[in-house]
Amino acid sequence: MQPRHIAELILTGFKKHYLLFQKTTAKAPLAFAKRDWQAINDISRLRISHYDDRVNETTATLRQQQTEQLDEQLWLEVKKLYQHFLCFHPQAELAETFYNSVFCRLYHRRYFHNDFIFVEATLKDAPAVPVEAEYRSYFPVVDGLKPTIKQIINHFDFKAPFVNLERDIRLLVKAFYKQAPDTHHKAWQMRFDILHTPFYRNKAAYIVGRVVSQSGVQPFIIAVLHHEDKGLYLDALLTKSSQMRVIFGFARAYFMVETHAPCALVRFLNQLMPNKTIAELYNAIGFHKQGKTEFYREFLNHLTHSNDEFTIAPGTPGMVMMVFTLPSFGYVFKVIKDKFGESKPFGRDTVLKRYQLVKKHDRVGRMADTIEYSNVVFPLARFDSNLLQQLHQTIGSSMVIEGDWLIIKHLYIERRMTPLNLFLENADDASAADAIEEYGQALKEMIAVNIFPGDMLLKNFGVSKHKRIIFYDYDEVQYLTDMNFRALPKAKTYDDYLMDEQSYSVAPQDVFPEQLCTFVMPNPIYKQFLMSTHPELIDVNFWKQAQQNIKNGQVSHIYPYPTAQRFIHHW
């Protein structure tokens, strides 16, 4: 095969992937208009599998047309030509990642360096797609603030009427005056830059933009919801970067948003959320493979500019995962152990399936996103002998040492958080009460979207920077509707009552909510905190009703912003 033919074949595979991805994404607005929430979830899951399908197709074609042995000179020329094709491509960075995926499926990891793949983004010095391609500007000085906001709303054809748009705009303007700095209060002192298409997720659409004035740039997010079958309404205005970071958080499902130039969209969002990494923003808008590429580049850059050693991650060691971390880098590396603890009656394949289940599910801000990698290379010098020994003992079949490098065959990477049990050890009563209340709320929100976490011990939950409680241990995750919730059998005789343990049969899917406090909250103070805020969690009927709601087709909406900011309180 000629270099040009190979380069064109890979680029054609990428084009097919991107067109299908955008075609799938474009179904979200109609599903939102029809209030077809199941379709929204189906679209979200389908997009996640698109990428690997197209990579597999392209790889299979190349295998049919060339030998398995790498022709180094040929592939050096292929990469050079491919790079030329991308100079003015609007999705160049995604096309580079697609190339990497195809090459890495074809050849051995010894070729995974910048000569043959795009370890570095080679187009960083090329002319960038202008950010202006992704937004439209509005000038209140021309028509006034209220008419301008009405123009913005009407620009988006939601294919459904508003219940009372005049009321919503009045509440929106009132909220804007309350939240915006004084310098924004005059129409001639500002400009609105609004992204062309809404962001869809779950049961909401979000209009995203920024307010530009002499005092700086401020996020501008409007949440749009359905009022049952009566029509649309504006639900909230958010104008703080910190609020925006929560909405775009790592524990939420990916947004569905149409874009011709993802790099321009990400740069726009990064200006509004400078504390978010490029990788996190690509993930947030659904390009999780690009997020994976950008994250690995961030990791390599961090390794170059740091010298600390890897250590065992803080927290109680698990029976399924070996977890280590680099203290100066805010993530943990999770590797499936060779052997599980006796209380884990399942194997590696089950763990892989459960992590994939969470990846494709609505995480409602309560389940950390994971990045899955194969054949990750670590500098051996950054591991001390004690840690290496522990790795050999627990994940020996998943690691290889080659010269100065440690290669992990398969791992997951998650955001590092403070384990809830460790947080509580050092928390005062007020902080502990808040954390336990958040823990209970996290359980309720996962339950509402048909997720049963399985192991609900405090050690399996983390405390984020925003003091949110996030679940991160997925080896026992199952659908709520697959579980059998039971009340504890009552003692039949006085002798039964005196026994420390009741004698009754328990099936694998059986769950006894009454035992939640017994096993999860042994500290009586924590139990008191939980019972004062979420007493229904130990009521078997609460769990059964949650199951029935899901079976009846009810789809819950978890608000990613404080309910106090909802306009509905001022109707």
UniProtKB/Swiss-Prot annotation:
Gene Ontology MF term list: [isocitrate dehydrogenase (NADP+)] kinase activity; AMP binding; ATP binding; phosphoprotein phosphatase activity; protein serine/threonine kinase activity
Main location: cytoplasm
Reactions it catalyzes: L-seryl-[isocitrate dehydrogenase] + ATP = O-phospho-L-seryl-[isocitrate dehydrogenase] + ADP + H(+)
Highest taxon, organism lineage: Bacteria
GO biological process: glucose metabolic process; glyoxylate cycle; tricarboxylic acid cycle
Coiled-coil residue windows: none
Active site per UniProt: D369
Keywords per UniProt: ATP-binding, Cytoplasm, Glyoxylate bypass, Hydrolase, Kinase, Nucleotide-binding, Protein phosphatase, Serine/threonine-protein kinase, Transferase, Tricarboxylic acid cycle
GO cellular component, as recorded: cytoplasm
Entry EC no(s): 2.7.11.5, 3.1.3.-
One Pfam family from the record: AceK_kinase
UniProt subcellular location: Cytoplasm
Protein task: Bifunctional enzyme which can phosphorylate or dephosphorylate isocitrate dehydrogenase (IDH) on a specific serine residue. This is a regulatory mechanism which enables bacteria to bypass the Krebs cycle via the glyoxylate shunt in response to the source of carbon. When bacteria are grown on glucose, IDH is fully active and unphosphorylated, but when grown on acetate or ethanol, the activity of IDH declines drastically concomitant with its phosphorylation.
HAMAP family tied to this protein: AceK
Entry similarity comment: Belongs to the AceK family.
The protein's name in its UniProt record: Isocitrate dehydrogenase kinase/phosphatase 2
Gene: aceK2
